[in-house]
Curated annotation (Swiss-Prot):
Lineage of producing organism: Eukaryota, Metazoa, Chordata, Craniata, Vertebrata
Entry keyword Signal: yes
UniProt record similarity statement: Belongs to the serpin family.
Name the record gives this protein: Serine proteinase inhibitor 2.4
Top-level taxonomic group: Eukaryota
Protein species of origin: Apodemus sylvaticus
Site (Reactive bond): 381-382
Cellular location(s): Secreted
Positions glycosylated per UniProt: 23, 38, 104, 269
SUPFAM superfamilies attached to this UniProt entry: Serpins
Keywords for this protein: Glycoprotein, Protease inhibitor, Secreted, Serine protease inhibitor, Signal
Amino acid sequence: MAFIAALGIFMAGICPAVLCFPNGTLGRDTAVQEDQDNGTQVDSLTLASINTDFAFSLYKELALKNPDKNIVFSPLSISAALAIVSLGAKCNTLQEILEGLKFNLTETPEADIHLGFRHLLHMLSQSGKEEQINIAVSMFIEKHLQILAEFQEKVRSLYQAEAFTADFQQADEARKFINDYVRKETQGKIQELLSDLVERTSMVLVNYIYFKGKWKMPFDPRVTLKSEFYLDEKRSVKVPMMKIEDLTTPYFRDEELSCSVVELKYIGNASALFILPDQGRIEQVEASLQPETLRKWKDSLRPRKIDLLYLPKFLVSTDYSLEDVLSELGIKEVFSAQADLSRVTGTKDLSVSQVVHKAMLEVAEKGTEAAAATGVKFVFRSGRVPTMTVRFDRPFLMVVSHTGVESILFLAKVTNPN
């Protein structure tokens, strides 16, 4: 069982801040109104490739700023939140956001980008009973602020946004209200999203994604044992190491990049790609991350019998402020006094003050549902030397994707499972 949750937060206010909604609560629009489309959405594969490009660009910046640390984030959560902000932007502010998300505006009209996101989010919401994927946008708005009706309608119809009013003059009460909401929506996995509120906050945009999946071939918790995980050539830590024998699963050995790629499938429409660089080669693999690399790995996967597969049981959580990272990707003006977010309220006195992203990734034999391993028998045979062993006992990468829309839900690097 794997559980993953991520939250993206945009702090907003007048001068130091961003979005707003009128008084009252706006519910999610559950229907996808195809008959109201006046354009053509970006097709799923094109959007997936663009999102992958953004995901790897963001990953490289995070890895640069957080060397030798665990990394986990949801590129889809971040890109969807930025796309929503772009609905309120104009001129250079708008161009920077969409180009920072890796869209070519000479090839793809702005309206088509949002239709593509709407279709993607709708497809992800159609998860089956064996998997759980919840992705949603919620806005908490200062009760005295008003926004343009056109912006309000676009956010609602394109991104199914749910909005609430809050009194940010009572900062502690507003923070508790938001934290309680997030705790409930993530089933208690994110306990405290906000530790404080930026001064003069007028809006908090929360974009969250929650994924819970069962392995098609679960690990047997009875054979999970403490084992060495090598942080580098000189240091190691003891971690709970899961094991599975006689597993047939998609596998590819990339000799060019000196890494092994193993795909483990979830029941339903999701899979996890584990990339294990050879000792000392993780930086080489990270530098090569681009849509073409991921496509090569996926196209090269072939069913392979692995006699022994070892994978650490781990829980990784991260907390990022993304303003500097996004600025490195060209998204700068929205954080400055020059920001033009006049499609939100009709004035230019808004800017984004803070972008916070929290994510949690848990990989285990099974989750809270004991049925994950029901009916699965493992045969342990003695007296035979395994012909192939894959041991994730050093830093590795993990890509969780939705196979139906070919989009990356989560991207992670595990440098220390503890």
